[in-house]
């Protein structure tokens, strides 16, 4: 009888885990199409990527505060100090803001599918920057993996029929910003020994990102948006979906591992590329596109399998053993 109860409990846990992974893939894929629709569609006509990103970060800041401080349904990890906040969290927040801003801007110029193909180059950017700051070690195996990914992205770009170099520049800028953010997060974990789950990170980071976006928004988009007729319901739902996506990452990582998120991310990328070809008339996939992207994804999958063996994942932050006895200077 006890064995049956244990089996039922195990199966129930397995179902919840698979459901959380499916939720993450659905929300992650859906949010990409939602953002593209809001920014580019004739129905909404909201071509303000900076304003949209600012709205997301402001919405996230308010919800994080309500969930952790007012309703107290979630707990923020302790150990944050003013010195760490200024030297680490603010730069991470700035890079996160830049990543979202440039990535959303790219949707105005290139297709969703091509954007996802370009994002496959991310491990290369992270590895190069990691070598520069001493977090990664150059090896023949890693060079081979990076070469495979780079070759695949180049081939998929060559196969793009309607390439827009302005969009490519924006997307590559977003990739570099995201790589810098991941490097800064790894430094925060390995060298400063700070333990932050994704929700805690969003709690500390969202206000910084919002402020970093607010300043350029005043000069670049505010005057254009003054005369725009806001679709409050659509933009609120878009912001809520973005926040739900961040919570789904927290849910998946808490039930599985950072490697699972990476594998789910690969599945999501393929899903986005294929679905975008069905949804958007502007997306025309070629055999060269798909071949190059397949090669890049093989490289990314190999990298994802290799990376956790060389150190703790930077997606799931954990306390460094080196600094586990170090006491914080004081609460923020």
UniProtKB/Swiss-Prot annotation:
**Compartmental location:** Membrane
Where is this chain compositionally biased, Polar residues type? 312-322
| Alphabetically ordered keywords of this record | Membrane, Sugar transport, Transmembrane, Transmembrane helix, Transport
- Kindly name one Pfam family recorded for this protein: TPT
The record describes its membrane topology as:
Multi-pass membrane protein
Q: Where is the composition biased (Basic and acidic residues)?
A: 323-332
Source taxon at top rank:
Eukaryota
Q: Can you quote a single GO CC term?
A: membrane
SUPFAM superfamilies reported in the protein's UniProt record: Multidrug resistance efflux transporter EmrE (SSF103481)
Q: Where is this region: Disordered?
A: 312-332
Provide the transmembrane region boundaries.
19-39, 46-66, 82-102, 120-140, 143-163, 165-185, 199-219, 233-253, 259-281, 285-304
Its chief place of residence is: membrane
The UniProt family comment states: Belongs to the TPT transporter family. TPT (TC 2.A.7.9) subfamily.
Q: Mind telling me what this protein is named? A: Probable sugar phosphate/phosphate translocator At1g53660
Record the organism.
Answer: Arabidopsis thaliana
């Amino acid at each position: 009888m006890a064995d049956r109860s244990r089996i039922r409990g195990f199966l129930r846990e397995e179902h919840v885990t698979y459901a959380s992974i499916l939720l993450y893939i659905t929300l992650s894929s859906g949010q990409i199409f939602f953002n593209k629709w809001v920014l580019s569609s004739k129905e909404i006509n909201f071509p303000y990527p900076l304003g949209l990103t600012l709205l997301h970060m402001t919405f996230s800041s308010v919800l994080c505060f309500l969930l952790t401080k007012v309703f107290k349904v979630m707990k923020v990890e302790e150990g944050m100090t003013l010195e760490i906040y200024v030297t680490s969290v603010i730069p991470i927040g700035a890079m996160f803001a830049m990543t979202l801003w440039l990535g959303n801007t790219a949707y105005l110029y290139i297709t969703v599918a091509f954007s996802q193909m370009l994002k496959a180059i991310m491990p290369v950017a992270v590895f190069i920057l990691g070598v520069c700051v001493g977090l990664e070690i150059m090896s023949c195996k890693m060079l081979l993996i990076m070469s495979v990914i780079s070759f695949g992205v180049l081939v998929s770009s060559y196969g793009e029929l309607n390439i827009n170099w302005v969009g490519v520049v924006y997307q590559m800028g977003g990739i570099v910003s995201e790589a810098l953010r991941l490097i800064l997060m790894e430094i925060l974990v390995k060298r400063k020994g700070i333990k932050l789950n994704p929700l805690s990170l969003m709690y500390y980071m969202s206000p910084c990102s919002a402020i970093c976006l607010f300043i350029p928004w005043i000069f670049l988009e505010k005057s254009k948006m003054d005369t725009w007729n806001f679709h409050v319901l659509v933009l609120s739902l878009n912001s809520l979906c973005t926040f739900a996506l961040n919570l789904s990452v927290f849910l998946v990582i808490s039930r599985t591992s950072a490697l699972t998120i990476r594998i789910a991310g690969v599945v999501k990328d393929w899903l986005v590329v294929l679905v975008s070809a069905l949804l958007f008339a502007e997306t025309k996939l070629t055999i060269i596109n798909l071949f190059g992207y397949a090669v890049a994804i093989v490289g990314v999958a190999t990298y994802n399998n290799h990376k956790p063996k060389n150190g703790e994942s930077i997606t799931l932050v954990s306390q460094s053993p080196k600094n586990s006895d170090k006491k914080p200077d004081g609460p923020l």
